[in-house]
From Swiss-Prot:
Coiled coil: none
EC nos: 3.1.1.96
Taxonomic path: Bacteria, Pseudomonadati, Pseudomonadota, Gammaproteobacteria, Alteromonadales
Gene: dtd
GO CC annotation, single: cytoplasm
Motif Gly-cisPro motif, important for rejection of L-amino acids per UniProt: ranges: 137-138
Protein name: D-aminoacyl-tRNA deacylase
Database matches in CDD domains: Dtyr_deacylase
Catalytic activity annotation: glycyl-tRNA(Ala) + H2O = tRNA(Ala) + glycine + H(+); a D-aminoacyl-tRNA + H2O = a tRNA + a D-alpha-amino acid + H(+)
Main location: cytoplasm
Domain notes: A Gly-cisPro motif from one monomer fits into the active site of the other monomer to allow specific chiral rejection of L-amino acids.
Subunit structure: Homodimer.
Alphabetical list of InterPro entries matching this protein: Daa-tRNA_deacyls_DTD, DTD-like_sf
Biological processes, Gene Ontology terms: D-amino acid catabolic process
Length: 145
């Protein structure tokens, strides 16, 4: 399971000209599901995302996590993160989770974060989305479990 996280001052998702999810300070999470992913991996990754220290403390050091800064999550499914780009000029998605598996783990990821008290907005699974963000830093990390 892959989470590409970006520290943002704001981010939003639009589907069919309607904003369906938006946050101010927090993390935009692009979430990719691979074939071998499980609920256990999802919980481990969600915990890491929420606990990862990517926000600056009073000394400018990345030492604070999402909860410590009162931040929110915007979680967007992105199967292209599971692409194999090692050969040729066209990505292979053979390692990506099935749509049913990915939807289930995506929904469980969101529910897990919300259950931990984190304000969590979402995109729309499988939709053509326009994602806008102001990357603060820029700060971007590729987390995998």
């Amino acid at each position: 399971m892959i989470a590409l996280i970006q520290r943002v001052s704001r981010a939003s998702v639009v589907v069919d000209n309607q904003t369906i999810g938006a946050i101010d300070k927090g993390l935009l999470v692009l979430l990719g599901v691979e074939q071998q992913d499980t609920r256990e991996k999802m919980e481990k990754l969600a915990t890491k995302v929420m606990s990862y220290r990517v926000f600056s403390d009073e000394n400018g050091k990345m030492n604070l996590n999402l909860e410590q800064v009162g931040g929110s999550l915007l979680v967007v499914s992105q199967f292209t993160l599971a692409a194999d780009t090692g050969r040729g000029l066209r990505p292979s998605f053979s390692g990506a989770g099935t749509p049913d598996q990915a939807l289930a783990l995506y929904e469980e990821f969101v529910a897990f974060c919300r259950a931990k008290g984190v304000t969590t907005e979402t995109g729309q699974f499988g939709a053509d989305m326009q994602v806008s963000l102001v990357n603060d830093g820029p700060v971007t990390f590729n987390l995998q479990v």
